[in-house]
Amino acid sequence: MPLVKRNIDPRHLCHTALPRGIKNELECVTNISLANIIRQLSSLSKYAEDIFGELFNEAHSFSFRVNSLQERVDRLSVSVTQLDPKEEELSLQDITMRKAFRSSTIQDQQLFDRKTLPIPLQETYDVCEQPPPLNILTPYRDDGKEGLKFYTNPSYFFDLWKEKMLQDTEDKRKEKRKQKQKNLDRPHEPEKVPRAPHDRRREWQKLAQGPELAEDDANLLHKHIEVANGPASHFETRPQTYVDHMDGSYSLSALPFSQMSELLTRAEERVLVRPHEPPPPPPMHGAGEAKPIPTCISSATGLIENRPQSPATGRTPVFVSPTPPPPPPPLPSALSTSSLRASMTSTPPPPVPPPPPPPATALQAPAVPPPPAPLQIAPGVLHPAPPPIAPPLVQPSPPVARAAPVCETVPVHPLPQGEVQGLPPPPPPPPLPPPGIRPSSPVTVTALAHPPSGLHPTPSTAPGPHVPLMPPSPPSQVIPASEPKRHPSTLPVISDARSVLLEAIRKGIQLRKVEEQREQEAKHERIENDVATILSRRIAVEYSDSEDDSEFDEVDWLE
C-alpha cells in the first residue's frame, strides 16, 4: 500500500452542499470555490516550502562535500607540483605510525528511519490512532522484552535479517578456519612443471643435424628437466657404469664423443664438489723420469675417478677440494706395528695412515713419499725418508694423524671388475668422547694431542671432526684436563632492577594483549542496525584469506 506523502486539501473546489435559506446560490458557490482555491494555494505553498527546504539542505551538504574535496585536491596539487625530491618530508616512522584514512561523511543507509521521516508523513502518523498502552506491562516481564513489541514491532524484519546475516558470516569464518587447518595438515605438494608440446618440426631439425648433435640436445633437455624437477637418481648410474668397467668394452675410447664429454664433465663435477677429499701429496721425480698419472681412490664412495690422458702432456689433472678430511676412527691399543703393516698389505680392511715422524723430524723437513715403483705397498712406504734436495712445499703440521682417504700416486693399471666392486667399505665414524671430557674444550684437545715423550704417538689421539686442531704449545701453557668446573655461585647474580624490568615487560605484554582483546570486542559491539556495515563485513569475510578481523576495516571507511 503506497503512503501519501503530501495531500493537498481540499480536493474538490465546487463539490459542496449549499445551505438552505440562501437566496443567491450562484454567489455562494463562487465564494466557496474561491475559498477552496485559496486553501489549496496555501497547502501548495506549504509543501513547496518543504520541497525547497529539502533541496536546500541537499544542495548545502553537496556544496560542503565539494568544497572539502576541492581543498584536499589543492593541498595535493601543491605538494605534488612543489615537491623537492632531495628532501624527505615524510619519514618512514611517520608512515608506519600514521593511521589509515577514515571518512567522516555519514551515508544515508537507513531510509525508513524515524529520524529520516518527512514532516508530512509525521503529520499523517500523528493523525492516526495510538496503539494500546502495552508498555505499562514491560516492568512486570521476566524476559526483559518490551510489551509493545508483541503487538507492533517495526524493526522485526530487519532484526531477523540481521541475525541471519551475522550467523552466515560466523559460519563462513568457521569454514575458512577448518579449511586452513586442513591445508596445514596436508603436506605441501611440489610444483609440477607442465609438459612441453610435441613439436615434430624440431625433431626433424635435430635429425638433420646428425645423431651426435641430436643426442647432445637430448642430454641438454634432461639437464633442464633435472634443474626444474630436482635431481634424479637414474641419471647418475650411467657414468658410474662406464667408470667401473674401464677395462671392458665400455672404455672411453669406445664411447662416442658426446657421451665421453658428458662423462668427463660429470666426473669432474664429482671431484670438484666433494668436500671431504684430502689434497694429493706432491709427486717427487727427476727431470727425465716419466711422471705417473694420479688416480684418486675414494674409500667413501667406492668409485674410481679417472680421466683420459691429454695428448699434449700425457697427464690428467685432478682437482680436489682443499677442505681438510675427517679424522680416522681410533684403533685398539692391542695392535702393533707389524699387525698394522700386515693389515695395510691386505685388501679387505680399509687403509690405515702411516704414523707421523717425531716432532723434530717433522719440523726439519716435510714427510713426502718417494715415487712408488711396484704395485704393492712396500714396508718403507710407512716410514719414508725425506729427500735432501726437495724444498718444503707445505708448512709443517703438528704430529696429528692424517685422514685415511688420502690420494696415493700409483701407476694406472686397468683393475678387474671384481677388484673394483670389492673395494673396502668406508670407515665407521669416530666414537663419542667419554662423558667427563667436553669435545668443545680446546684445552682438553691440546692435552690429549701430546702424549708423553716415552710413548709412541698413535693415530687414535685425533680429535673429533668438530674439534679444531691446535698447534703444539709449550709445556708451561698446557693446562691439565682435570680442571675443576666453575661453581654456579661465581656467575653474576641478576640484580633486582633487571628482575623488575623483566616483570614490567611481561606486564606490558599482558596489558597490550588485554587492550587488543578489548578493541576487538568493541569492534564487535560497534555493529548496529547498519545494512551497509553488515553486508561489507560479510563480503570481507568471504574474500579474506586470513582469520583475522580485517573485515572491520571496511566499517571504518563507511563511517
UniProtKB/Swiss-Prot annotation:
The modification Omega-N-methylarginine is found at residue 341. One of its GO terms (biological process) is actin cytoskeleton organization. It is found in: Cytoplasm, Cytoskeleton; Synapse; Cell junction, Focal adhesion. Residues 322-332, 347-360, 423-437, 460-477 have a biased composition (Pro residues). SMART domains: WH2 (SM00246). The modification Phosphoserine is found at residue 489. It comes from Pongo abelii (Sumatran orangutan). Residues 333-346 have a biased composition (Low complexity). Component of the WAVE1 complex composed of ABI2, CYFIP1 or CYFIP2, BRK1, NCKAP1 and WASF1/WAVE1. Within the complex, a heterodimer containing NCKAP1 and CYFIP1 interacts with a heterotrimer formed by WAVE1, ABI2 and BRK1. CYFIP2 binds to activated RAC1 which causes the complex to dissociate, releasing activated WASF1. The complex can also be activated by NCK1. Binds actin and the Arp2/3 complex. Interacts with BAIAP2. Interacts with SHANK3; the interaction mediates the association of SHANK3 with the WAVE1 complex. Interacts with ABI1 (via N-terminus). Transmembrane segments: none annotated. Belongs to the SCAR/WAVE family. Keywords: Actin-binding, Cell junction, Cytoplasm, Cytoskeleton, Methylation, Phosphoprotein, Synapse. GO terms for molecular function: actin binding; Arp2/3 complex binding; protein kinase A regulatory subunit binding. One of its GO terms (cellular component) is lamellipodium. The modification Asymmetric dimethylarginine is found at residue 341. Its main location: cytoplasm. Residues 304-313 have a biased composition (Polar residues). InterPro entries: SCAR/WAVE_fam, WH2_dom. Residues 497-514 form the WH2 domain. Residues 182-202 have a biased composition (Basic and acidic residues). This is Actin-binding protein WASF1. The gene is WASF1.
